[in-house]
Regions:
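Cap/insert and terminal regions of metallo-dependent hydrolase folds
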Residues: 208, 233-320, 406-411, 429-492
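Conserved beta-strand hairpin/beta-sheet module of binuclear metal-dependent hydrolase folds
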Residues: 39-87, 95, 208-227, 250, ...
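Hard-cation-handling environments
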Residues: 275-415
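Pre-active-site segment of Zn-dependent metallo-hydrolases
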Residues: 48-50, 60-119, 123-174, 232-241, ...
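Short, Lys/Arg-enriched N-terminal segments with co-localized hydrophobic residues
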Residues: 23-37
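Active-site neighborhood of phospho(di)ester-bond hydrolases with catalytic His/Asp-centered motifs
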Residues: 69, 93-102, 109, 121-124, ...
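Metallo-beta-lactamase
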Residues: 138-203, 335-374
Length: 509
Protein backbone atom coordinates (compact mmCIF):
# COMPACT_ATOMS: atom_id res chain seq x y z
CA UNK A 1 0.00 0.00 0.00
CA UNK A 2 1.37 3.46 -0.95
CA UNK A 3 0.79 6.01 1.79
CA UNK A 4 0.37 9.11 -0.33
CA UNK A 5 -1.62 10.76 2.44
CA UNK A 6 1.60 11.65 4.31
CA UNK A 7 2.13 14.69 2.10
CA UNK A 8 2.18 18.02 4.04
CA UNK A 9 1.70 16.37 7.43
CA UNK A 10 3.91 17.26 10.38
CA UNK A 11 6.49 14.77 11.66
CA UNK A 12 4.25 14.14 14.68
CA UNK A 13 1.31 13.18 12.46
CA UNK A 14 3.47 11.07 10.12
CA UNK A 15 4.49 9.02 13.14
CA UNK A 16 0.84 8.73 14.13
CA UNK A 17 -0.06 7.55 10.62
CA UNK A 18 2.56 4.78 10.69
CA UNK A 19 1.24 3.54 14.01
CA UNK A 20 -2.36 3.59 12.81
CA UNK A 21 -1.50 1.79 9.54
CA UNK A 22 0.26 -1.04 11.33
CA UNK A 23 -3.00 -3.00 11.16
CA UNK A 24 -4.07 -3.23 7.49
CA UNK A 25 -7.74 -4.00 8.22
CA UNK A 26 -8.27 -0.35 9.31
CA UNK A 27 -6.99 0.99 5.97
CA UNK A 28 -10.19 2.72 4.76
CA UNK A 29 -11.22 4.05 8.16
CA UNK A 30 -7.81 5.57 8.73
CA UNK A 31 -7.69 7.22 5.32
CA UNK A 32 -10.99 8.97 6.14
CA UNK A 33 -9.59 10.02 9.51
CA UNK A 34 -6.47 11.49 7.91
CA UNK A 35 -8.46 13.48 5.34
CA UNK A 36 -10.18 15.23 8.26
CA UNK A 37 -6.96 15.78 10.20
CA UNK A 38 -5.65 19.32 10.64
CA UNK A 39 -2.04 19.96 11.58
CA UNK A 40 -1.73 23.36 13.28
CA UNK A 41 1.32 24.60 15.14
CA UNK A 42 2.78 27.87 16.36
CA UNK A 43 6.26 29.29 16.95
CA UNK A 44 7.87 32.68 17.52
CA UNK A 45 10.91 34.33 15.93
CA UNK A 46 10.85 37.32 18.26
CA UNK A 47 9.20 38.71 21.40
CA UNK A 48 9.86 35.31 22.99
CA UNK A 49 11.05 35.95 26.57
CA UNK A 50 11.79 39.50 25.46
CA UNK A 51 9.65 42.48 24.47
CA UNK A 52 10.82 43.53 21.01
CA UNK A 53 10.94 41.84 17.61
CA UNK A 54 7.39 40.42 17.45
CA UNK A 55 7.19 37.72 14.76
CA UNK A 56 4.78 34.84 15.36
CA UNK A 57 4.18 32.05 12.84
CA UNK A 58 0.96 30.02 12.68
CA UNK A 59 1.42 26.93 10.50
CA UNK A 60 -1.70 25.23 9.11
CA UNK A 61 -1.11 21.99 7.17
CA UNK A 62 2.30 23.23 6.04
CA UNK A 63 1.12 26.74 5.09
CA UNK A 64 2.25 29.68 7.21
CA UNK A 65 0.70 32.94 8.40
CA UNK A 66 2.89 35.46 10.20
CA UNK A 67 1.46 37.77 12.85
CA UNK A 68 3.57 40.95 13.06
CA UNK A 69 7.05 41.42 11.64
CA UNK A 70 8.73 43.71 14.12
CA UNK A 71 12.28 44.89 14.66
CA UNK A 72 14.44 44.04 17.65
CA UNK A 73 15.50 47.01 19.76
CA UNK A 74 18.07 47.41 22.55
CA UNK A 75 21.81 46.71 22.23
CA UNK A 76 22.60 48.17 18.84
CA UNK A 77 25.03 45.62 17.41
CA UNK A 78 23.06 42.68 18.76
CA UNK A 79 19.73 44.06 17.52
CA UNK A 80 21.19 44.92 14.12
CA UNK A 81 22.48 41.37 13.72
CA UNK A 82 19.14 39.84 14.72
CA UNK A 83 17.22 42.18 12.40
CA UNK A 84 19.40 41.18 9.45
CA UNK A 85 19.37 37.45 10.05
CA UNK A 86 15.86 36.39 11.01
CA UNK A 87 14.97 33.16 9.22
CA UNK A 88 11.59 33.03 7.47
CA UNK A 89 10.64 30.58 4.72
CA UNK A 90 9.02 33.04 2.30
CA UNK A 91 7.98 30.19 -0.02
CA UNK A 92 5.73 28.81 2.75
CA UNK A 93 4.53 32.18 4.03
CA UNK A 94 1.09 33.00 2.61
CA UNK A 95 0.22 36.22 4.43
CA UNK A 96 1.13 38.59 7.25
CA UNK A 97 -1.21 40.10 9.83
CA UNK A 98 -0.17 43.38 11.42
CA UNK A 99 -1.69 44.09 14.85
CA UNK A 100 -0.44 47.68 15.11
CA UNK A 101 2.13 50.16 13.88
CA UNK A 102 4.80 50.20 16.57
CA UNK A 103 8.31 49.58 15.20
CA UNK A 104 8.77 46.40 17.24
CA UNK A 105 5.71 44.99 15.44
CA UNK A 106 6.02 46.37 11.88
CA UNK A 107 9.65 47.49 11.48
CA UNK A 108 10.95 44.54 9.44
CA UNK A 109 8.15 44.34 6.87
CA UNK A 110 10.44 45.95 4.23
CA UNK A 111 13.12 43.33 5.04
CA UNK A 112 10.55 40.55 4.67
CA UNK A 113 9.43 41.75 1.24
CA UNK A 114 13.10 42.16 0.24
CA UNK A 115 13.59 38.50 1.15
CA UNK A 116 10.92 37.59 -1.40
CA UNK A 117 7.59 37.61 0.41
CA UNK A 118 4.88 38.46 -2.15
CA UNK A 119 1.66 37.88 -0.20
CA UNK A 120 -0.83 40.24 1.41
CA UNK A 121 -0.18 42.13 4.64
CA UNK A 122 -3.46 42.71 6.52
CA UNK A 123 -3.95 45.76 8.77
CA UNK A 124 -6.61 48.24 9.85
CA UNK A 125 -6.72 51.49 7.81
CA UNK A 126 -5.18 53.55 10.64
CA UNK A 127 -2.44 50.96 11.15
CA UNK A 128 -1.56 51.06 7.47
CA UNK A 129 -1.20 54.86 7.52
CA UNK A 130 0.92 54.83 10.68
CA UNK A 131 3.05 51.85 9.56
CA UNK A 132 3.90 53.67 6.31
CA UNK A 133 5.08 56.59 8.42
CA UNK A 134 7.09 54.47 10.89
CA UNK A 135 8.84 52.45 8.18
CA UNK A 136 9.71 55.47 6.04
CA UNK A 137 11.06 57.31 9.07
CA UNK A 138 13.26 54.31 9.86
CA UNK A 139 14.58 54.26 6.28
CA UNK A 140 15.51 57.95 6.57
CA UNK A 141 17.24 57.42 9.95
CA UNK A 142 19.21 54.45 8.60
CA UNK A 143 20.32 56.46 5.56
CA UNK A 144 21.53 59.30 7.82
CA UNK A 145 23.28 56.83 10.14
CA UNK A 146 25.03 55.19 7.19
CA UNK A 147 26.28 58.56 5.94
CA UNK A 148 27.47 59.55 9.43
CA UNK A 149 29.29 56.24 9.96
CA UNK A 150 30.83 56.43 6.49
CA UNK A 151 32.28 59.87 7.25
CA UNK A 152 33.55 58.70 10.64
CA UNK A 153 35.25 55.67 9.09
CA UNK A 154 36.84 57.81 6.38
CA UNK A 155 38.16 60.27 8.97
CA UNK A 156 39.71 57.42 10.96
CA UNK A 157 41.02 55.65 7.86
CA UNK A 158 38.89 52.60 8.60
CA UNK A 159 36.92 50.36 6.26
CA UNK A 160 33.18 51.09 6.14
CA UNK A 161 30.89 48.11 5.57
CA UNK A 162 27.58 48.91 7.29
CA UNK A 163 24.49 49.19 5.09
CA UNK A 164 20.90 50.09 6.00
CA UNK A 165 18.43 47.25 6.51
CA UNK A 166 16.17 48.82 3.91
CA UNK A 167 15.63 52.01 1.92
CA UNK A 168 12.68 54.14 0.81
CA UNK A 169 12.00 51.92 -2.19
CA UNK A 170 11.77 48.85 0.04
CA UNK A 171 9.24 50.66 2.25
CA UNK A 172 7.10 51.56 -0.77
CA UNK A 173 7.17 47.93 -1.94
CA UNK A 174 6.09 46.66 1.49
CA UNK A 175 3.35 49.30 1.81
CA UNK A 176 1.96 48.30 -1.59
CA UNK A 177 1.31 44.79 -0.23
CA UNK A 178 -0.85 46.04 2.67
CA UNK A 179 -4.57 45.23 2.41
CA UNK A 180 -6.81 47.10 4.85
CA UNK A 181 -9.54 45.48 6.90
CA UNK A 182 -11.81 47.51 9.19
CA UNK A 183 -12.70 46.44 12.70
CA UNK A 184 -15.22 43.60 13.10
CA UNK A 185 -15.34 42.68 9.41
CA UNK A 186 -14.64 39.09 8.32
CA UNK A 187 -12.16 38.37 5.54
CA UNK A 188 -11.02 35.01 4.17
CA UNK A 189 -7.22 35.22 4.00
CA UNK A 190 -7.03 31.56 2.94
CA UNK A 191 -9.76 29.11 1.86
CA UNK A 192 -9.93 27.73 5.40
CA UNK A 193 -8.92 30.79 7.46
CA UNK A 194 -11.03 33.85 8.34
CA UNK A 195 -9.52 36.97 9.93
CA UNK A 196 -11.42 39.48 12.03
CA UNK A 197 -9.92 42.54 13.79
CA UNK A 198 -11.15 43.91 17.12
CA UNK A 199 -10.00 47.14 18.78
CA UNK A 200 -7.09 46.42 21.16
CA UNK A 201 -7.19 49.90 22.73
CA UNK A 202 -3.37 50.17 22.61
CA UNK A 203 -2.71 52.82 19.96
CA UNK A 204 -4.70 54.25 17.05
CA UNK A 205 -5.70 51.34 14.81
CA UNK A 206 -4.35 48.60 17.09
CA UNK A 207 -6.14 45.28 16.83
CA UNK A 208 -6.67 41.87 18.32
CA UNK A 209 -6.38 39.41 15.42
CA UNK A 210 -8.98 36.63 15.65
CA UNK A 211 -8.35 33.72 13.28
CA UNK A 212 -11.05 31.12 12.66
CA UNK A 213 -9.63 27.98 11.05
CA UNK A 214 -12.17 25.67 9.38
CA UNK A 215 -12.03 21.91 9.67
CA UNK A 216 -13.83 19.35 7.50
CA UNK A 217 -16.83 19.54 9.82
CA UNK A 218 -18.46 22.67 11.24
CA UNK A 219 -17.70 21.72 14.84
CA UNK A 220 -14.00 21.30 13.98
CA UNK A 221 -13.41 25.07 13.70
CA UNK A 222 -10.53 26.37 15.81
CA UNK A 223 -10.25 29.99 16.96
CA UNK A 224 -6.79 31.43 17.65
CA UNK A 225 -6.56 34.94 19.11
CA UNK A 226 -3.39 37.04 18.85
CA UNK A 227 -3.64 39.97 21.25
CA UNK A 228 -0.76 42.02 19.86
CA UNK A 229 -0.48 44.62 22.63
CA UNK A 230 -3.44 45.04 25.00
CA UNK A 231 -4.37 48.60 25.96
CA UNK A 232 -6.02 49.97 29.08
CA UNK A 233 -9.50 51.18 29.89
CA UNK A 234 -10.30 54.91 30.16
CA UNK A 235 -7.33 56.15 28.12
CA UNK A 236 -7.96 59.39 26.20
CA UNK A 237 -8.62 59.53 22.45
CA UNK A 238 -9.04 55.80 21.67
CA UNK A 239 -11.60 53.21 22.75
CA UNK A 240 -11.22 50.59 25.47
CA UNK A 241 -9.95 47.12 24.49
CA UNK A 242 -12.79 45.12 22.94
CA UNK A 243 -14.31 42.27 24.93
CA UNK A 244 -16.47 41.05 22.03
CA UNK A 245 -13.88 38.71 20.50
CA UNK A 246 -15.13 35.25 19.41
CA UNK A 247 -14.49 32.58 22.06
CA UNK A 248 -10.85 31.55 21.48
CA UNK A 249 -9.47 28.02 21.77
CA UNK A 250 -5.95 29.44 22.03
CA UNK A 251 -4.66 32.90 22.95
CA UNK A 252 -1.22 34.28 22.12
CA UNK A 253 -1.04 36.80 24.95
CA UNK A 254 1.34 39.69 25.57
CA UNK A 255 2.99 40.05 28.99
CA UNK A 256 4.94 43.32 28.89
CA UNK A 257 3.83 44.32 32.38
CA UNK A 258 3.26 40.84 33.75
CA UNK A 259 4.87 41.81 37.05
CA UNK A 260 3.82 45.43 37.40
CA UNK A 261 0.77 47.31 38.62
CA UNK A 262 0.18 50.69 36.98
CA UNK A 263 -1.13 53.79 38.60
CA UNK A 264 -4.73 54.53 37.74
CA UNK A 265 -5.18 56.26 34.38
CA UNK A 266 -7.09 59.07 36.08
CA UNK A 267 -4.03 60.22 38.09
CA UNK A 268 -1.88 60.88 35.00
CA UNK A 269 -3.09 64.43 34.47
CA UNK A 270 -2.71 65.34 38.17
CA UNK A 271 0.85 63.99 38.32
CA UNK A 272 1.75 65.79 35.10
CA UNK A 273 0.44 69.08 36.54
CA UNK A 274 2.51 68.71 39.73
CA UNK A 275 5.74 67.94 37.83
CA UNK A 276 5.20 70.90 35.48
CA UNK A 277 4.56 73.28 38.40
CA UNK A 278 7.79 72.19 40.15
CA UNK A 279 9.81 72.63 36.97
CA UNK A 280 8.31 76.08 36.35
CA UNK A 281 9.27 77.12 39.90
CA UNK A 282 12.88 76.12 39.11
CA UNK A 283 12.84 78.00 35.81
CA UNK A 284 13.89 74.86 33.98
CA UNK A 285 12.91 72.89 30.91
CA UNK A 286 10.84 69.71 30.95
CA UNK A 287 12.21 67.22 28.43
CA UNK A 288 9.81 64.37 27.65
CA UNK A 289 10.99 61.42 25.53
CA UNK A 290 7.79 60.10 23.97
CA UNK A 291 6.75 57.64 21.32
CA UNK A 292 5.70 59.58 18.24
CA UNK A 293 2.51 57.55 17.96
CA UNK A 294 -0.16 57.67 20.68
CA UNK A 295 1.99 58.84 23.60
CA UNK A 296 2.77 62.23 22.04
CA UNK A 297 -0.88 62.80 21.09
CA UNK A 298 -1.97 61.74 24.58
CA UNK A 299 0.45 64.22 26.17
CA UNK A 300 -0.79 67.01 23.89
CA UNK A 301 -4.35 66.12 24.88
CA UNK A 302 -3.51 66.34 28.61
CA UNK A 303 -1.54 69.58 28.25
CA UNK A 304 -4.48 71.08 26.36
CA UNK A 305 -6.79 70.13 29.24
CA UNK A 306 -4.40 71.53 31.88
CA UNK A 307 -3.97 74.85 30.08
CA UNK A 308 -7.66 75.10 29.17
CA UNK A 309 -8.67 74.59 32.80
CA UNK A 310 -5.93 76.98 34.00
CA UNK A 311 -4.37 74.28 36.17
CA UNK A 312 -0.95 75.19 34.76
CA UNK A 313 0.15 78.52 33.27
CA UNK A 314 0.42 78.84 29.51
CA UNK A 315 4.11 78.08 28.90
CA UNK A 316 5.54 77.12 25.48
CA UNK A 317 5.01 73.45 24.63
CA UNK A 318 7.03 72.14 21.68
CA UNK A 319 6.50 68.86 19.86
CA UNK A 320 9.89 68.35 18.23
CA UNK A 321 9.45 65.25 16.11
CA UNK A 322 8.57 65.30 12.42
CA UNK A 323 7.10 61.82 12.75
CA UNK A 324 4.95 62.83 15.73
CA UNK A 325 3.72 65.84 13.75
CA UNK A 326 2.78 63.63 10.80
CA UNK A 327 1.24 61.03 13.12
CA UNK A 328 -0.95 63.72 14.68
CA UNK A 329 -2.25 64.54 11.20
CA UNK A 330 -3.13 60.86 10.75
CA UNK A 331 -4.97 60.86 14.09
CA UNK A 332 -7.15 63.67 12.80
CA UNK A 333 -8.41 61.66 9.80
CA UNK A 334 -9.28 58.41 11.59
CA UNK A 335 -12.31 59.19 13.77
CA UNK A 336 -13.41 55.53 13.48
CA UNK A 337 -10.85 54.84 16.23
CA UNK A 338 -11.94 57.58 18.66
CA UNK A 339 -13.69 57.10 21.96
CA UNK A 340 -16.98 58.98 22.40
CA UNK A 341 -15.43 62.01 24.13
CA UNK A 342 -12.86 62.60 21.38
CA UNK A 343 -15.38 61.80 18.65
CA UNK A 344 -17.79 64.41 20.01
CA UNK A 345 -15.04 67.02 20.45
CA UNK A 346 -13.97 66.69 16.81
CA UNK A 347 -17.19 65.95 14.99
CA UNK A 348 -19.88 67.53 17.17
CA UNK A 349 -18.20 70.51 18.84
CA UNK A 350 -15.52 71.06 16.13
CA UNK A 351 -12.81 71.46 18.77
CA UNK A 352 -9.33 70.13 17.99
CA UNK A 353 -7.86 68.27 21.00
CA UNK A 354 -4.46 68.34 19.27
CA UNK A 355 -4.16 72.11 18.84
CA UNK A 356 -4.08 75.12 21.20
CA UNK A 357 -2.23 78.45 21.47
CA UNK A 358 0.68 77.29 23.66
CA UNK A 359 1.45 74.34 21.38
CA UNK A 360 4.02 74.49 18.60
CA UNK A 361 4.94 71.65 16.22
CA UNK A 362 8.61 71.96 15.27
CA UNK A 363 9.51 70.84 11.76
CA UNK A 364 12.91 72.18 10.66
CA UNK A 365 16.29 71.11 12.04
CA UNK A 366 17.21 74.78 12.55
CA UNK A 367 14.17 75.41 14.73
CA UNK A 368 14.89 72.24 16.68
CA UNK A 369 18.44 73.39 17.41
CA UNK A 370 17.22 76.83 18.43
CA UNK A 371 15.23 75.32 21.31
CA UNK A 372 18.50 74.61 23.08
CA UNK A 373 19.30 78.34 23.10
CA UNK A 374 15.97 79.32 24.64
CA UNK A 375 15.53 79.75 28.38
CA UNK A 376 12.90 77.85 30.35
CA UNK A 377 10.35 77.24 31.50
CA UNK A 378 9.14 75.22 28.54
CA UNK A 379 8.13 71.70 27.61
CA UNK A 380 9.86 69.77 24.82
CA UNK A 381 8.22 66.51 23.72
CA UNK A 382 10.47 64.58 21.36
CA UNK A 383 11.06 61.08 19.96
CA UNK A 384 12.38 58.37 20.20
CA UNK A 385 10.48 57.23 23.26
CA UNK A 386 13.27 54.92 24.47
CA UNK A 387 15.94 57.59 23.81
CA UNK A 388 17.74 55.48 21.23
CA UNK A 389 17.51 57.78 18.20
CA UNK A 390 16.01 61.01 16.92
CA UNK A 391 16.02 64.60 18.13
CA UNK A 392 15.47 63.62 21.77
CA UNK A 393 19.18 62.71 21.96
CA UNK A 394 20.21 66.29 21.20
CA UNK A 395 17.77 67.68 23.77
CA UNK A 396 19.04 65.28 26.42
CA UNK A 397 22.67 66.09 25.63
CA UNK A 398 21.99 69.82 25.96
CA UNK A 399 19.83 69.68 29.09
CA UNK A 400 20.59 66.61 31.19
CA UNK A 401 23.44 68.16 33.19
CA UNK A 402 21.48 71.26 34.29
CA UNK A 403 19.91 70.73 37.73
CA UNK A 404 17.07 73.16 36.92
CA UNK A 405 15.75 70.81 34.25
CA UNK A 406 13.47 67.78 34.48
CA UNK A 407 13.54 64.62 32.36
CA UNK A 408 10.06 63.10 32.46
CA UNK A 409 9.74 59.42 31.48
CA UNK A 410 6.26 58.39 30.38
CA UNK A 411 6.68 55.08 28.57
CA UNK A 412 8.20 51.62 28.49
CA UNK A 413 12.00 51.49 28.35
CA UNK A 414 13.46 48.24 27.00
CA UNK A 415 16.58 46.68 28.47
CA UNK A 416 19.90 48.14 27.29
CA UNK A 417 18.36 51.42 26.11
CA UNK A 418 19.34 54.91 27.23
CA UNK A 419 15.78 55.32 28.50
CA UNK A 420 16.21 52.30 30.80
CA UNK A 421 19.49 53.72 32.13
CA UNK A 422 17.73 57.00 32.92
CA UNK A 423 14.88 55.12 34.57
CA UNK A 424 17.47 53.27 36.67
CA UNK A 425 18.80 56.66 37.85
CA UNK A 426 22.34 56.15 36.55
CA UNK A 427 24.45 59.17 37.49
CA UNK A 428 26.32 59.32 34.19
CA UNK A 429 25.12 58.27 30.73
CA UNK A 430 26.56 58.06 27.24
CA UNK A 431 24.73 60.07 24.57
CA UNK A 432 25.90 60.02 20.94
CA UNK A 433 29.36 58.88 21.99
CA UNK A 434 29.94 61.36 24.83
CA UNK A 435 29.44 61.00 28.59
CA UNK A 436 27.14 63.35 30.50
CA UNK A 437 26.48 63.76 34.21
CA UNK A 438 22.80 63.37 35.09
CA UNK A 439 22.07 66.45 37.21
CA UNK A 440 18.53 67.03 35.94
CA UNK A 441 15.65 65.59 37.96
CA UNK A 442 14.39 62.25 36.63
CA UNK A 443 10.63 61.86 37.01
CA UNK A 444 8.38 59.03 35.91
CA UNK A 445 4.62 58.68 35.42
CA UNK A 446 3.50 55.05 35.09
CA UNK A 447 -0.14 55.93 34.52
CA UNK A 448 0.60 56.83 30.88
CA UNK A 449 1.36 53.24 29.93
CA UNK A 450 -0.47 51.99 26.84
CA UNK A 451 -0.04 48.36 27.99
CA UNK A 452 -2.39 46.68 30.43
CA UNK A 453 -0.75 45.55 33.68
CA UNK A 454 -1.12 41.99 34.99
CA UNK A 455 -4.35 42.71 36.88
CA UNK A 456 -5.87 44.53 33.89
CA UNK A 457 -4.97 41.64 31.56
CA UNK A 458 -6.66 39.09 33.82
CA UNK A 459 -9.70 41.38 34.15
CA UNK A 460 -9.87 41.44 30.34
CA UNK A 461 -9.54 37.64 30.18
CA UNK A 462 -12.33 37.30 32.74
CA UNK A 463 -14.57 39.55 30.61
CA UNK A 464 -14.19 37.77 27.26
CA UNK A 465 -15.77 34.38 26.51
CA UNK A 466 -13.19 31.78 27.60
CA UNK A 467 -15.57 28.79 27.56
CA UNK A 468 -13.50 27.10 24.80
CA UNK A 469 -10.06 28.17 26.01
CA UNK A 470 -7.53 25.34 26.02
CA UNK A 471 -4.21 27.15 26.35
CA UNK A 472 -2.51 30.53 26.62
CA UNK A 473 0.83 31.11 24.88
CA UNK A 474 2.68 33.92 26.62
CA UNK A 475 4.86 36.26 24.50
CA UNK A 476 6.16 39.86 24.48
CA UNK A 477 7.63 40.08 27.97
CA UNK A 478 10.93 39.86 29.80
CA UNK A 479 11.59 36.63 31.73
CA UNK A 480 11.01 38.07 35.20
CA UNK A 481 7.67 39.60 34.19
CA UNK A 482 6.56 36.39 32.48
CA UNK A 483 7.41 34.17 35.45
CA UNK A 484 5.36 36.38 37.77
CA UNK A 485 2.46 36.57 35.30
CA UNK A 486 2.57 32.80 34.75
CA UNK A 487 1.99 32.22 38.48
CA UNK A 488 -0.65 34.95 38.64
CA UNK A 489 -2.57 33.36 35.77
CA UNK A 490 -2.45 29.98 37.53
CA UNK A 491 -3.74 31.54 40.75
CA UNK A 492 -6.62 33.16 38.86
CA UNK A 493 -8.01 30.14 37.05
CA UNK A 494 -5.80 29.89 33.94
CA UNK A 495 -3.59 26.83 34.55
CA UNK A 496 -2.76 25.93 30.93
CA UNK A 497 -0.06 28.44 30.05
CA UNK A 498 3.17 28.10 28.06
CA UNK A 499 5.92 30.72 28.18
CA UNK A 500 6.97 30.73 24.53
CA UNK A 501 10.65 30.14 23.77
CA UNK A 502 12.33 31.45 20.61
CA UNK A 503 12.00 29.05 17.67
CA UNK A 504 10.29 26.30 19.68
CA UNK A 505 7.25 24.73 17.99
CA UNK A 506 4.01 24.33 19.94
CA UNK A 507 1.41 21.94 18.53
CA UNK A 508 -2.15 23.26 18.56
CA UNK A 509 -3.74 20.35 16.67
Amino acid sequence: MKILIFKNLTAHNKKLCKILHSDIKYHYTINLFLEDMMAISFYSLGAAQEVTGSKHILEINGRQIMVDCGAFQGKRNESDNKNRNFDVACDKLESVILTHAHYDHCGLLPVLTKKGFKGNIYATPATRALADLIMMDSAHIQARDAEYLRKQAKRKGEKFNWTPLFNEGDVINAANQIVTLSYERNMFIAPDVQLKFFDAGHILGSAFASLSISGQRKDDNINVLFTGDIGRNNKPIIRNPSTEVPAPDYIVLESTYGDRKHEDVDVAMDELAQIVKRAIAQGGKIIIPAFAIERTQELVYYFHMLVDRKIIPQIPIYVDSPMATNATSIFQVHPECYDKKTHDAFLVHHKNPFGFNALKFVTSVEESKSLNQKEGPMVIISADGMCEAGRILHHLANNISDSRNTILLVGYMAENTLGRRLRNRETEVKIMGDWYKVNASIEQINAFSAHADYEEMVTWLNTIDTSRLKKIFMVHGEKKAQEYFYNYLHENGYPNVDIVKYGETYDIV
